[in-house]
Every structure is written in C-alpha cells, then in structure tokens.
C-alpha cells in the first residue's frame, strides 16, 4: 500500500541490525529553503499517488525496507497498480521475488526507462527513478546484511519466464513520433543519439534568450552555441540528459516553430564538436564530463555487479556498465544518462572504501588517444561503449542461455546494439536474460546492461550485424583536472591498477585505510574495528566503520607500493596528455584559440580565507572575475589548498598568471608557489548550477561560493547566489552530508 503521512517519515529495517539506516525527514525538511517546499516532489496531493518514490526509488531491489509513520492513513493503491500493469502488459508480479519487466526496452526511446514501474514484496512501491534520500552506504549495507538468494537474485525468477521472454518480440511502434512514417526512420535517426543536437533552418535574427526558452521547455539545456546563427541559421544545443535530447528531437520532428517553420536537426557527436573547436570555433559547453566514469577497485576484494549497480544507481539512472578490459574486472566503466549524476557520483565515491575495496573514480573519455602496447591486443568498442567487448567473436543480434546456467564465461556476455552511438536498448533479436543462480560475476569479455537489468549473451553469428568500431589500446586516458588531488601521480596508476597509498588489511586489530591525499596534506582515512570480519568483506557493516582525518606524508616511497604490482606498466604519456589538456597557454589565449575562462588556483596556504584570496586577486585583477570559491575542509575550517575562479574575459587569465604564477604567497611562513590550471567545469552559469543545490550553501556565508556582477556599472560587485531549483538534488545532498560529511577533502570537485 502507498501510505499518506502527516508526520515525519523514517526509513527503517524490520530486522534489528547495527547498520540500520535512518533519515530524519523533519530535520531534512527544515534544511530545505521555503522555495522548494511547494515542489510537486514533496507534495501530499492525491495527484501524485507514488509520492513514496521520493524516499525509495531505483531499479535495484532492496529487501526488508519499509516506510513507517505515525498518524498515517492508507490510500488504496489497487487502481494505481492495475493502471500500471495495463501500461506495462509484460510486467510479471510474483509475490515471492523481486521482478522486473521482461519486455526488452524499445530501441528508439530511452525515455521510457525512467517510466518503468517496479514492485516488490510487501507494501512498498518503487519506481525506476533516482534515490534522493537513499545513500550508497544504505544500499551496500543492506546487501551485506541480506545477501541475495538464488530466487531473489534472478530478475527473471524461473526458466518458464525466461522462455517467454525469448519468444516475445519488442514493440517498435509504441513510442514512435507522430510525424514518422516507418520504424526504420526512428532507427536511422535515434540509433546515433547523443546529447548534442545540430539544429538548422532557424531564423537568423532570433535572440539567444528565445532559443534558450524554446529548448529549455524540451529538457535541461547545458548550453547553446549560436556562433553560426546569424549567418547560416544554425545552432548546437547541448542537453545534460541524453533521454531529454531524444525527446527534444522528437518534438522538433512533430512540431513547427517560429511562424509555422519546420526545424531540421541531426545528432552531433562530441568528436565533431571537438573538431570544430580545433578549427577555431568557440564552444563553451564542451567539457570532460560525458556521463562516463572509470572506476578502479583496489584492495582485498572486488565489488560484485549487484553491489556496484546498487551504489551507482543511488546517484541516478545508469545507461551501461562494463569492464574496461576483458581480463580485468577491477576496472569498470559506467555511463549515466545524466552527466550531472556522473559528476555527483564522482564527487561522492572517489577515494571511498567499501568492504576492503578502495574506489578510485575519474571521468572516462572514450574518444581519447589510446596508448597501445605490443603485449596487449586492443579492444573494439563503438562510440559511447554502447556495444560489447568481444575480441574473439562478431557482433551478434540474438542469443540463447538457460536461466539456471552457471556464471557466464568469457564469450557468454555480449549484446548487439542498434547503431554505434549510445545504444538505448537491445537489438530486435536480443532479449534480456535472467541472472545466473551463482553469484554475480563479470564476464571476462562482457558487460552488464543496466538498462535491461540483466546480462545478455549471443548464440548466433550474424555477419550482417557488423558495425564500425573504434580501436582502443590497453591504456585510455581519463580526463580530469591536472595536478589535482585526484590526478597527481594517479592518472596512470588508475588505469594500470596501481594505488601507491592503498594498503589492505594486515592484521585482525584496528586497521586504517588511506585514500589518496588531498592538497591540504590531509587524507581521508577509514578505521575498521577489531570486531569486523576482514576475511569476508561482505560481513563488514557500516556500523563498524569510522571516518577520520589524519596528517599524511605527501611523499611517496617505493617501499609503500604493493610489491605484487607491476610498476613497469606506469605510462607517463597518459598523465602528460591530461596535464597538457588543462595547462594554461598564454599564447593560445592571446590569439583567441583558447577561450576558457574558469581556472583552478593551486597551492594556496591552508590558513588563507576567501576574503584574503579576494584581496590577493584584486591587486592585479579587480573587477575581472564573476565567480570565486575557496574550497574548505569543514572538519578543521581550513581550505584544502585550491580555489576556483571564473574570469569574465579569457585575457584576464594572462594578467593574473604573469603576475602571480611562479611566485610565493609570502604569508603564514608558507613556501608554496602559486600555480593555475583550467577547471573541468567552465563558465559562471554552469558553476552556479553545480553549487546552488549543494549543502555547502547552507554553511557559514564565508565558506560559500561567491558570484559577482559580470557587466555594467556594478561590475565586480557581489550579487546574491541563486536559490536552489532542484528539490531532489538538494535532498540528496543533505542526506549525503548527514552520512559521510560535507565535501570531504578527497578530490577536486570542479
């Protein structure tokens, strides 16, 4: 049943456990600004029957979770359940097991992924949406307390259901745009979907504000390039979410704009935009975050598929996840539909330790230059890694596998996709299969398709299904800020399985794990009590974990490395490539080639305050910047050694750099040398969007990001920071801060 409540809610577990997770909703709601309290997400109006999905959502099954409240009245959910089953006729309702829809996703419409309803045993209604108040600690602790049994682990619980799925044909007509005449039209267009729309036939005199208003109605717009609008009637629109980009494309095909004008569009790949930038175009919205993350797992254990999926889906819906290389299951690539979810996941998970496993996370660029070695064969994957890694087999469009089969082998996990881009779903001949009865495992040449919530495998070889692919070498460069705490001595380590500062358990007494060191010289450590089981990480509950900060020696000796690791695999070329990408070149700025405006100021004395930093910058650049944020370690109220500043004009970077870079700060007896590099997030608007829904805006005003007037007579004067505009992200940030602290000093956030 869906429960209507008039009192604070809490998430509890029926069975007593040391790791029971509770959220104080009353305290959380008081932390929200009044402007968000009227949000439909928080409304008790009967027009929003699945309102409990704000607390519990996500396609990953979580057992033994229920909503409890006082003074509650039950509302009848039978009609809603019936309506949902009418919408999804292939939905299987089994009272004993968790069930997912056995119908393959429509290959032309990824937007329906967020609409799929999932029901579980009991009275809790879950939806395939994100989990704002649930944290990844809750998910992993629940998995540890109640490891999935054979009957629960399988998303298709019986061989009969799997057999039915094999005979079911996916519908390709249900979500077709009204202006399309055939299924092949959708397939041709949306098989190459991306987050970028190349729109033509626009009026050449239309204002930028009008375009922004138009496309914002179709989805969350990341940016619009109008450099060719006045001459050719062309613009490039970037969306945060690829599903919204697809929906916007459908709207453009079925509607007319600007006095009955039909707009034409084409999906534009990131590589094409990068070529335009290389040829002198000024496109501000392109950055390293394409929703793709590279996760490297270090330590005594590797998280299972179910655990990783449960953790990652806490931050938002996943498009895909798979191993980086076929023989290494400790390096995983995942992609979120929404790039903002990827940024949030990176911020929260990088440097975290879960069950004797240290997670190192960085952005992954599938189009980056590969570093090939003669000792390893390259991997063939399509753009957006929507296809499948399989060095010894062709692309396939159909498969057969028994539901009670053992763990998939090297050739058992494969799938064919429509097109070579983001691959919204399985191909026509492909159907999702149930998980095996053995524990979840990565196929050595497979991946885990979270869109269909099940591994898939090939049976036939179909030469007609061959697709063009891009060859990648053994080592691929993850793009992140150079010389930051995340990338300093870590780019190549991350890709080659080396973590110089990671030490597994060595005894049964209290142990300390150190995550990578931040700029402050502080490192995030996690102590495990002696009562925790070290031999079996799945028995390790979060109740026995304690986070603390300790002084760390920033130097690295060879003896601190694991002797079992192969140090010869270190590839300085990868780190150099990332460093060159974000290094500041005054000549390129002066010539107008590099138009980036946001930089990271590094090596700041830790006792420096934000006001002191403003005074330091104003000596040479007063009134030339409109955003400033000195990141703070809220444990000791000191900065973490770096700040982010957005200059109004790129030429101001030259003025500041020539005056300050390479000089000492000459304060607090510090011998640090000022340095700068480009930040990942560029532009005042995008920086505001990143921080406006963050818990940091609830801290002391002296610790918050500051924005300033960019133009006009008041240029350089501080202006109010915009209020939050996303209730989910705000609630999620509050819950995360309650559990793991606010912005722990593990990595750079911009």
Swiss-Prot record:
BP term (GO), one: positive regulation of metaphase/anaphase transition of meiosis II
Gene3D superfamilies to which the protein is assigned, alphabetical: 3.30.70.330
Gene Ontology CC entries for this record: cytoplasm; cytosol; Mei2 nuclear dot complex; nuclear chromosome; nucleus; Tor2-Mei2-Ste11 complex
Pfam families from the UniProt entry: RRM_1 (PF00076), RRM_2 (PF04059)
Subunit and partners: Binds rad24 when phosphorylated.
Role, per record: Crucial for commitment to meiosis but it is not sufficient itself for the commitment. May be a splicing regulator.
Protein name, as recorded: Meiosis protein mei2
Gene name per UniProt: mei2
């Amino acid at each position: 049943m869906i429960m209507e409540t008039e009192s604070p809610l809490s998430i509890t577990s029926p069975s007593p456990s040391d790791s029971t997770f509770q959220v104080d909703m009353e305290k959380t709601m008081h932390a929200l600004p009044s402007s968000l309290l009227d949000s439909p997400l928080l409304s008790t109006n009967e027009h929003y029957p699945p309102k409990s999905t704000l607390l519990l959502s996500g396609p990953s099954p979580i057992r033994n979770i229920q909503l409890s409240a006082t003074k509650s009245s039950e509302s009848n959910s039978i009609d809603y359940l019936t309506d949902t089953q009418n919408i999804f006729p292939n939905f299987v309702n089994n009272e004993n097991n968790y069930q997912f829809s056995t119908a393959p996703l429509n290959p032309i419409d990824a937007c329906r992924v967020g609409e799929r309803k999932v029901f579980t045993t009991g009275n809790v209604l879950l939806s395939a949406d994100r989990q704002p108040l649930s944290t990844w600690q809750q998910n992993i602790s629940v998995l540890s307390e109640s490891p999935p049994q054979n009957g629960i682990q399988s998303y298709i619980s019986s061989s009969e259901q799997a057999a039915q799925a094999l005979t079911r044909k996916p519908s390709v007509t249900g979500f077709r745009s009204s202006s399309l005449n055939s299924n092949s039209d959708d397939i041709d267009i949306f098989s190459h979907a991306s987050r970028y729309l190349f729109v033509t036939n626009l009026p050449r005199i239309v204002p930028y504000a009008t375009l922004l208003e138009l496309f914002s109605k179709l989805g969350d717009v990341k940016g619009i390039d109008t450099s060719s609008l006045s001459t050719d009637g062309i613009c490039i629109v970037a969306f945060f979410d690829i599903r919204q980009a697809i929906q916007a494309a459908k709207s453009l095909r079925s509607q007319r704009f600007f006095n009955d004008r039909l707009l034409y569009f084409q999906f534009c790949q990131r590589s094409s935009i990068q070529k335009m930038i290389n040829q002198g175009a000024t496109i501000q919205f392109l950055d390293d975050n394409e929703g793709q993350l590279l996760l490297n797992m270090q330590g005594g254990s590797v998280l299972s598929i179910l655990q990783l999926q449960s953790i990652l889906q806490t931050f938002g819906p996943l498009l895909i996840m798979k191993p980086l290389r076929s023989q290494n299951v400790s390096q995983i690539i995942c992609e979120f539909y929404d790039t903002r979810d990827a940024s949030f996941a990176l911020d929260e998970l990088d440097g975290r330790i879960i069950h004797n496993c240290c997670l190192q996370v960085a952005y992954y660029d599938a189009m980056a230059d590969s570093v090939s070695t003669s000792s390893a064969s390259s991997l063939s994957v399509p753009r957006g890694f929507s296809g499948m890694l399989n060095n010894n087999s062709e692309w396939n469009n159909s498969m057969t596998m028994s539901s009670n089969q053992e763990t998939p082998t090297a050739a058992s996990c494969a799938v064919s996709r429509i097109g070579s881009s983001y691959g919204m779903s399985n191909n026509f001949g492909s159907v999702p299969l149930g998980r095996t009865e053995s524990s979840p495992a990565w196929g050595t040449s497979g991946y885990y398709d979270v869109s269909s919530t099940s591994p898939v495998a090939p049976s036939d070889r179909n030469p007609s299904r061959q697709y063009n692919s891009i060859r990648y070498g053994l080592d691929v460069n993850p793009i992140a800020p150079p010389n930051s705490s995340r990338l300093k001595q870590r780019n190549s380590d991350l890709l080659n399985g080396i973590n110089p500062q990671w030490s597994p358990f060595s005894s049964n007494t209290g142990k300390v794990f150190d995550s990578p060191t931040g700029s402050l010289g502080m490192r995030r450590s996690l102590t495990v009590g002696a009562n925790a089981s070290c031999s079996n990480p799945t028995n390790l509950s979060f109740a026995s974990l304690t986070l603390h900060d300790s002084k760390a020696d920033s130097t690295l000796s060879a003896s601190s490395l694991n002797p079992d690791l192969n140090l010869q695999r270190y590839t300085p070329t990868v780190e150099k490539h990332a460093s060159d990408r974000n290094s500041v070149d005054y000549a390129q700025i002066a010539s107008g080639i590099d138009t980036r405006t946001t930089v990271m100021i590094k090596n700041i004395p830790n006792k420096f305050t934000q006001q002191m930093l403003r005074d330091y910058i104003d000596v040479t650049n007063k009134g030339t910047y409109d955003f400033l944020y000195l990141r703070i370690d809220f444990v000791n109220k000191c900065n973490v050694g770096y700040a982010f500043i957005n200059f109004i004009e790129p030429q101001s970077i030259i003025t500041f750099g020539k005056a300050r870079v390479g000089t000492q700060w000459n304060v607090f007896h510090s011998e640090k040398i000022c340095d700068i590099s480009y930040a990942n997030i560029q532009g005042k608007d995008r920086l505001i969007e990143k921080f406006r829904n963050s818990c940091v805006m609830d801290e002391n005003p002296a610790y918050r990001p500051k924005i300033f007037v960019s133009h006009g007579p008041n240029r350089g004067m501080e202006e109010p920071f915009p209020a939050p505009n996303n209730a989910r992200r705000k609630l999620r940030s509050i819950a995360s801060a309650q559990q793991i602290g606010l912005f722990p000093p593990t990595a750079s956030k911009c």
